[in-house]
């Protein structure tokens, strides 16, 4: 009598270890890139809030001949829409103002070291956005 042996199918331990190493390497590359992309996309939350505050400052100046030093007097929120940034007016007078978006501590955006704060400075009719690399224009 001839016995037929069934061939076992499956992965060997070595094959599984190789697959795990490949997954680990891909994860080590992909995760930091993903996190950087998320931080960059969340900066839009700050730029939108700063642009809105800029418009409200100009509207306020038409009626008051000076820029406001208070977010509440221009009708703007001190927090960005998604809550990742705090918006403030650093200085304001008749010809210029500075708006600043600072990441809220304890939120994921607080670890954004590339663009820790975003600033718009309006001076004599010219707007300056800094850091320039953090503004997608």
Predicted regions and their residues:
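Periplasmic/extracellular, small/polar-rich flexible segments of pilin-like filament-forming proteins
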Residues: 61-137
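N-terminal leader/signal peptides at the extreme start of proteins
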Residues: 1-11
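Residues at secondary-structure transition points
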Residues: 8, 40-44, 48, 92, ...
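Membrane-proximal N-terminal amphipathic helix
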Residues: 36-66
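A short, glycine- and basic residue-enriched loop/turn
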Residues: 8-10, 23, 41, 64
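Alpha-helical hydrophobic helix detector
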Residues: 16-33
């Amino acid at each position: 009598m001839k016995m037929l042996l069934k061939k076992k199918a499956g992965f060997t331990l070595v094959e599984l270890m190789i697959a795990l190493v490949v997954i680990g390497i891909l994860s080590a590359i992909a995760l930091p890139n993903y996190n950087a992309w998320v931080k960059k996309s969340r900066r839009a939350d700050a730029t939108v809030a700063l642009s809105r505050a800029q418009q409200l400052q100009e509207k306020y100046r038409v009626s008051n001949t000076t820029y406001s030093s208070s977010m509440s007097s221009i009708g703007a929120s001190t927090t960005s829409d998604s809550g990742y940034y705090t918006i403030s007016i650093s200085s304001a007078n008749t010809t210029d103002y500075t708006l600043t978006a600072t990441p809220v501590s304890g939120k994921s955006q607080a670890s954004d070291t590339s663009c820790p704060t975003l600033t718009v400075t309006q001076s004599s009719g010219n707007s300056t956005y800094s850091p320039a690399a953090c503004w997608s224009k």
